[in-house]
């Protein structure tokens, strides 16, 4: 009964207005009030401040500064082998597996369209047909910077406006086409094993989505799809990111979806729905190397 009420509220609440209000408040320097909110949040969600570069709450002037706090050097070692992909974020696996007949598993009993996720771009969707996907959910307590699973050259970025439903497990299990209807930023990289998509999905009270090369992508929320293209590898202005390098962040947190082309990666066998992820640990092995787990 309670879960049903929570889902109905997702449809009824003014999500855009709540998100704007949360973003405004999270950027305010509220002195003692900001400190009170940060400490209450950390206590409620059991945030491990020992991992933070600066573990003192007083170091953070705004809630957003606290929320996107960097980690201490060395607490997230990145898997070194060239053929191994690293997990892009701290969180938990929502779902992972094969993209079948253009459909991606959202939750038990719920699929959504690959093409819809990619804003109706059928040419882009064709690059990932019959490929692999992994969805990583970042809970409020998690580290909220997103990193590269592998070396890659940025090909294009697409901002897709949309709803701002919560992306927690309850909502994922009950709101159809959740990730294809929410606001998102699609980043396409060319890698040594083919194309890779890294998609940052917005949600209720996610005040902004940022990337390291373009800064804040949203807000503003103008309600139109925006697309940027970038030079190829070796050309002037090409944007190359290394495995483990930060590529974006959420204020506040949300979900990351990775897409891979057909036959290009083997996910680590210990990963399944609900598995805890830590940025830098093994996500998958890239072909043509034979899996060696």
From Swiss-Prot:
| Record-level Gene Ontology MF annotations | phosphatidylserine decarboxylase activity
Q: What is its main location?
A: membrane
Pfam families in the cross-refs: PS_Dcarbxylase
Q: In which pathway does it act?
A: Phospholipid metabolism; phosphatidylethanolamine biosynthesis; phosphatidylethanolamine from CDP-diacylglycerol: step 2/2
Q: Among the entry's GO cellular component annotations, what is one?
A: plasma membrane
**Residues where Pyruvic acid (Ser) is found:** 254
Subunit-level organization: Heterodimer of a large membrane-associated beta subunit and a small pyruvoyl-containing alpha subunit.
Record protein name field: Phosphatidylserine decarboxylase proenzyme
Q: Which gene encodes it?
A: psd
């Amino acid at each position: 009964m309670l879960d049903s009420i929570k889902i109905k509220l997702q449809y009824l609440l003014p999500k855009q207005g709540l998100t704007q209000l949360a973003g405004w408040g999270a950027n305010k320097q509220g002195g003692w009030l900001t400190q009170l909110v940060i400490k209450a949040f950390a206590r409620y969600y059991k945030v491990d401040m020992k991992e933070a570069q600066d573990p003192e709450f007083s170091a953070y002037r705004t809630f957003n500064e606290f929320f996107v706090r960097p980690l201490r050097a060395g607490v997230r070692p990145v898997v070194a082998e060239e053929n191994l992909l690293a997990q892009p974020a701290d969180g938990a696996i929502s779902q992972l597996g094969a993209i079948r007949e253009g459909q991606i598993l959202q939750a038990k009993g719920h699929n959504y369209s690959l093409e819809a996720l990619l804003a109706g771009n059928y040419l882009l969707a064709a690059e990932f047909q019959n490929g692999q996907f992994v969805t990583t959910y970042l809970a409020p307590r998690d580290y909220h910077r997103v990193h590269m699973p592998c070396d890659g050259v940025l090909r294009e970025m697409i901002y897709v406006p949309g709803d701002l439903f919560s992306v927690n497990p309850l909502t994922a299990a009950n709101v159809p086409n959740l990730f294809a209807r929410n606001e998102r930023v699609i980043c396409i990289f060319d890698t040594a094993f083919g194309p890779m998509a890294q998609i940052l999905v917005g949600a209720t009270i996610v005040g902004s989505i940022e990337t390291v090369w373009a800064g804040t992508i949203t807000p503003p929320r103008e309600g139109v799809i925006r697309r940027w293209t970038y030079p190829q590898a070796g050309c002037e202005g090409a944007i190359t990111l290394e495995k483990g390098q930060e590529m974006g962040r959420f204020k506040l947190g949300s979900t990351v979806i990775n897409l891979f082309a057909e036959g290009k990666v083997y996910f680590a066998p210990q990963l399944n729905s609900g598995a805890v992820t830590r940025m830098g640990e093994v996500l998958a092995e890239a072909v043509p190397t034979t899996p060696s787990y």
